[in-house]
Structure formats: structure tokens, C-alpha cells
């Protein structure tokens, strides 16, 4: 976590390279695969922009165009090298695994439950819901998708088994300045 001074992510961001745990290396490799498949639409090097806009510190602000252009110089998943447990970043780059960490965590929780002999479960990590098996009565799990325009309503319900349902929206992490809403989903 970028908010934890002792985390692998913080150490890599501070030093530009180093050895990480097997688990962090696994998550980073998975993130790199997703980045490649999405042609960079998902990119763990987004951290400089998240920090610039204040989403990492809650000191929100609209940065100048020149600041954004400067931060963008370090944003590209191709600036990350993962070789075993060794990670290196190109100068000016820094990472944030927040976009993949909850999904990984819910998968690990499900695996631990399976290893303990549990046959039916739903794990809800707020925006990340993962289910395995069916409900105990044999029916599918039902997962509601929140309506971003109305906190107490939903857009629809998915019936599913053995799947993850992951959502993210600008209605949870955002700030307003001069009548304009700015959210944490950055393109």
C-alpha cells in the first residue's frame, strides 16, 4: 500500500528498485498482464497523477496542465520491470497497486475458505464482491450493482456463481471544485 511506510510499494517508489515479497511480485506480474491486455488502460504507474490530484492524501486540487504533462512523463506500465522478486522503475515513475489489490485479496480469502473446506461463500470488500459455489439452497448468488446517482438504490442485480463482480465509480472517491466534480478514475 502506498499509505504504509513499510510496504514493498512504498520502498520501490522511494528507491526506484529493490526486492519485493513473492506475493507483491505475483500481484505486480498480474497487473502487468492486465496492462498489456488493455494497452495501458489499466496502469499501476498512475500514482504520480493520483498524488498530484490529491487522491492519495485527501489534499484535493485541480493541477495545472503543465503539472499534469510533467507527471504523465512517468506514467507507462512499460516503465516497470519485474524479474522474479526484483522490481525496477524508470526514473520519474512510481506505482500504486490499489486498482488490483482488492481483487487479489478477495481471491486469496476465497482460496483460504476453500482450503478450510468451506463450499459456499460470498466476500464483499466494498466494490469488490467475489462468490464461490452456490448459496446453501443451491441457488445463484445475487449481487446488486449500486446506482452511482442514488446511494440507496441499485441499477440491477446479477445472478452468479464462482465469479468476481468488481465495480468502481466516481461517486465514492471524488472532490468538487468550482462546481465541477473530479473523481479518481483518471484516463
Language model features with spans:
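Mature catalytic core of soluble alpha/beta enzymes
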Residues: 1-187
Amino acid at each position: 500500500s502506498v499509505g504504509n511506510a513499510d510496504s514493498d510499494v512504498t520502498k520501490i517508489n522511494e528507491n526506484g528498485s529493490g526486492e519485493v515479497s513473492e506475493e507483491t511480485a505475483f500481484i505486480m506480474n498480474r497487473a502487468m498482464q492486465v496492462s498489456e491486455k488493455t494497452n495501458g488502460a489499466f496502469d499501476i504507474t498512475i500514482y504520480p497523477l493520483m498524488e498530484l490530484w490529491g487522491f492519495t492524501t485527501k489534499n484535493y486540487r485541480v493541477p495545472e496542465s503543465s503539472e499534469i504533462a510533467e507527471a504523465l512523463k512517468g506514467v507507462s506500465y512499460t516503465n516497470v520491470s519485474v524479474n522474479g522478486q526484483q522490481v525496477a522503475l524508470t526514473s520519474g515513475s512510481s506505482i500504486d497497486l490499489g486498482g488490483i489489490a482488492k481483487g487479489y485479496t478477495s481471491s486469496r480469502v476465497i482460496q483460504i475458505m476453500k482450503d478450510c473446506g468451506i463450499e459456499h461463500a460470498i466476500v464483499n470488500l466494498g466494490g469488490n464482491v467475489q462468490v464461490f459455489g452456490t448459496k446453501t439452497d443451491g441457488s445463484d448468488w445475487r449481487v446488486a450493482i449500486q446506482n452511482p446517482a442514488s446511494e440507496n438504490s441499485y441499477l440491477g442485480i446479477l445472478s452468479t456463481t464462482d465469479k468476481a463482480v468488481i465495480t468502481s465509480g466516481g461517486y465514492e472517491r471524488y472532490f468538487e471544485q468550482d462546481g465541477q466534480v473530479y473523481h479518481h478514475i483518471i484516463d
